[in-house]
């Protein structure tokens, strides 16, 4: 369950950012965290949310809502030059939709980024 390590990383990154803020003592809670997740990370978002609940216990991130934008990988065919989004078939075979070649360069789809977070303060 690699979702727990991702959840722990989210909490650690947010808490480190808050600690380094000039007015860190005014932050009362984190209400929402927006993520960018590449589809090739194979993260199960429901499991990530559950792991986040566990990892955020006792921190300002407790009860924060996680939202995610899922990013598709792209391919470039070394044979015909096709460029576009990666689509896999039921056999999990990845090939060029134009010429059927397996000689592809895959880019993107492995991202895992905190896009932003909404912090609540006294003010």
UniProtKB/Swiss-Prot annotation:
Pfam families: HypA (PF01155). InterPro entries: HypA/HybF. Involved in the maturation of [NiFe] hydrogenases. Required for nickel insertion into the metal center of the hydrogenase. Ni(2+) binds at residue 2. It comes from Methanococcus aeolicus (strain ATCC BAA-1280 / DSM 17508 / OCM 812 / Nankai-3). The gene is hypA. It comes from the Archaea. GO terms for molecular function: nickel cation binding; zinc ion binding. This is Hydrogenase maturation factor HypA. Zn(2+) binds at residues 77, 80, 96, 99. Belongs to the HypA/HybF family. GO terms for biological process: protein maturation; protein modification process. Keywords: Metal-binding, Nickel, Zinc.
């Amino acid at each position: 369950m690699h979702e727990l390590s991702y959840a722990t990383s989210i909490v650690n990154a947010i808490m480190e950012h808050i600690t380094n803020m000039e007015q860190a003592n005014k932050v009362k809670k984190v209400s929402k965290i927006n993520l960018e997740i590449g589809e090739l990370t194979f993260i199960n978002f429901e499991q990530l949310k559950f792991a986040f609940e566990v990892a955020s216990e006792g921190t300002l991130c407790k009860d924060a809502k996680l939202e995610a934008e899922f990013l598709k990988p792209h391919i470039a065919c070394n044979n015909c030059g096709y460029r576009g989004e990666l689509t896999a078939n039921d056999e999990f075979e990845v090939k060029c939709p134009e010429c059927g070649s397996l000689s592809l360069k895959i880019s993107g789809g492995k991202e895992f980024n905190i896009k932003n977070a909404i912090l609540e303060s006294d003010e």
